[in-house]
Amino acid sequence: MVNRTAIIKQPDNISFFNDVYKLQKEYQESLILDNSNPDFIWIGEHQLCYTLGRGSNYDNLLFSLNDDNYDVFKIDRGGEVTCHMPGQLVTYLVLDLKNFNKDLNWYLRKIEEIIIKILGTFNIDCHSRDGFTGVWIGNKKIASIGIGCKRWITINGFSINIDCELENFNKIVPCGIENCLMANMIDYNKNLNIQEVKRIVKKIIQEEFNFDFVSK
């Protein structure tokens, strides 16, 4: 596979979801217009918010949309509702699948494999589950995946719970899965920190997609 250039952003600050979503859309449109433009990777943390996919069931929100205490965004991705917050590492990939494999199922499974490799680096045993998208430790979900795709240019990506307030998931039915238990990496490896996980995420994505990263 020929190496592709990808712009990578790894902010140290906690980012507002909508700002980063708009940035993804800009890079997606740039690739649609000219696929010689670089792919785009964003790795960071968000302020507390909830996001829903295109066909999400609002019944999976256990609070009123009229409640101003919650930031809710309906976005261009599959899947049901999830939660983002500090202490959770989010990775967005805006890339041209025509350069890899024009198969969304392949891409979802590829992301699961990447997450399993990331956690394996920290000696955390985890797995995917037949019939579901994401990664689990035992019966607890540790990572969620949601993607959108337009003309084979992807958007959104995955989140891994590192050391976040899992109680925030009690406000929703996570990913539409009843009685879904969530987990943090820190509960399985006390020695890790989010900056080290971020470094490993970057490394494994670079290896798996043969990227030449350019910071911007």
UniProtKB/Swiss-Prot annotation:
Bilayer-crossing regions: none
Chief place of localization: cytoplasm
A Gene Ontology cellular-component term: cytoplasm
Residue numbers marked as site, Lowers pKa of active site Cys: 141
GO biological process: one example: protein modification process
Residue span, BPL/LPL catalytic domain: 35-213
EC assignment: 2.3.1.181
Alphabetical keyword list: Acyltransferase, Cytoplasm, Transferase
Pfam families: LplA-B_cat
Subcellular location: Cytoplasm
Catalysed reaction equations from the record: octanoyl-[ACP] + L-lysyl-[protein] = N(6)-octanoyl-L-lysyl-[protein] + holo-[ACP] + H(+)
Residues annotated to bind substrate: 77-84, 144-146, 157-159
Role description: Catalyzes the transfer of endogenously produced octanoic acid from octanoyl-acyl-carrier-protein onto the lipoyl domains of lipoate-dependent enzymes. Lipoyl-ACP can also act as a substrate although octanoyl-ACP is likely to be the physiological substrate.
Other information: In the reaction, the free carboxyl group of octanoic acid is attached via an amide linkage to the epsilon-amino group of a specific lysine residue of lipoyl domains of lipoate-dependent enzymes.
Family recorded in the similarity comment: Belongs to the LipB family.
Name the record gives this protein: Octanoyltransferase
The species this protein was found in: Prochlorococcus marinus (strain MIT 9215)
Gene behind the chain: lipB
